[in-house]
Amino acid sequence: MRVSDFDFDLPEELIALRPARPRDSARMLVIGPAENALADKSVSDLPSHLREGDILVFNDTKVIPARLFGTRRRGEASARIEVMLHKRESADEWRAFLRPAKKLNLSETIDFPGGLSAAVEEKGEGGEAGLRFSLSGPALDAAIAAAGEMPLPPYIARKRAADDEDVADYQTLHADEPGAVAAPTAGLHFTPALMAAIEARGVSTVRLTLHVGAGTFLPVTAEDTDTHKMHAERGEITEAEAAAINEARAKGGRIVAVGTTSLRLLESAVDEAGTVHPFRGETDIFITPGYRFRAVDVLMTNFHLPRSTLFMLVSALRSTEEMKRAYAHAVAEKYRFYSYGDACLIYGAS
């Protein structure tokens, strides 16, 4: 498929720079279950769209302050380098995107505040590099936490700098496992009050972990989806989590993924019969129209970028044309887009 098939117009003023307050007051566009059916709701209305026996699947990854600013020194000359961590390789190694990468050679060192430094061990395409830090394990984690900033998406960072509000705003209610460099943004809408209302409905919940990487922000540069390569992300579904999901389905409940990260991990761990298995490892699953969903029945997600892999994913749940019509409706009704924006509840096409 052509990547241009997934393009659409989005006025820049609809890109949300701050979240709704309270979080569950964000708007929610319900798409389906009937073809072309749309309903303008609020996230606080979510319980009314759930049934007793359904199970909500959350991603409990926690965002780390993965944007670092350091200095490369070469004799008397120096250059400021922005480092965006995106994938941990070992106790002292990270994959990262560097800017400007051209100002760094192999084996050169980047110095960060607090005495932390990193050597460039490998250079790849698009500014990607392999870094080995001067600290490892928990000591490295603490140094990154002290020196780093919250890694706001580029479309927000271009408009304003990260601040103290983002430290809380860019974490979900369920954030528990440090390792993500981007938030699983559908989870940002949940509050204790909303969770209580969901529980009162007889809906169960389960948490799994997918550490979201910076690759989620990378533009698709290929012209055809067949030639696009996804960045891999680490995830885990425990035996108990898989059992809870399978039990809910066996009893007639629907699997409701909160966010595309939860959906992608579930679809990476499911077999042809629809049974979800324990999973620990990396996934680079790339879902486009024509994909047959085996694990997920309903998806709650935010509004995504034109030509992005995530807009391709939601188009696979319904159809590209139906999702374009839904997004056109959202634009006309001035829904707020992207990470801090409003939500969609998308029923899988039957």
Swiss-Prot record:
Its EC number is 2.4.99.17. Keywords: Cytoplasm, Queuosine biosynthesis, S-adenosyl-L-methionine, Transferase. Transmembrane segments: none annotated. It holds the Pfam family Queuosine_synth. InterPro entries: QueA (IPR003699), QueA_dom1 (IPR042118), QueA_dom2 (IPR042119), QueA_sf (IPR036100). One of its GO terms (biological process) is queuosine biosynthetic process. It is an enzyme of class 2 (transferase). It is found in: Cytoplasm. It catalyses: 7-aminomethyl-7-carbaguanosine(34) in tRNA + S-adenosyl-L-methionine = epoxyqueuosine(34) in tRNA + adenine + L-methionine + 2 H(+). GO terms for molecular function: S-adenosylmethionine:tRNA ribosyltransferase-isomerase activity. Pathway: tRNA modification; tRNA-queuosine biosynthesis. One of its GO terms (cellular component) is cytoplasm. Belongs to the QueA family. Monomer. Transfers and isomerizes the ribose moiety from AdoMet to the 7-aminomethyl group of 7-deazaguanine (preQ1-tRNA) to give epoxyqueuosine (oQ-tRNA). This is S-adenosylmethionine:tRNA ribosyltransferase-isomerase. The gene is queA.
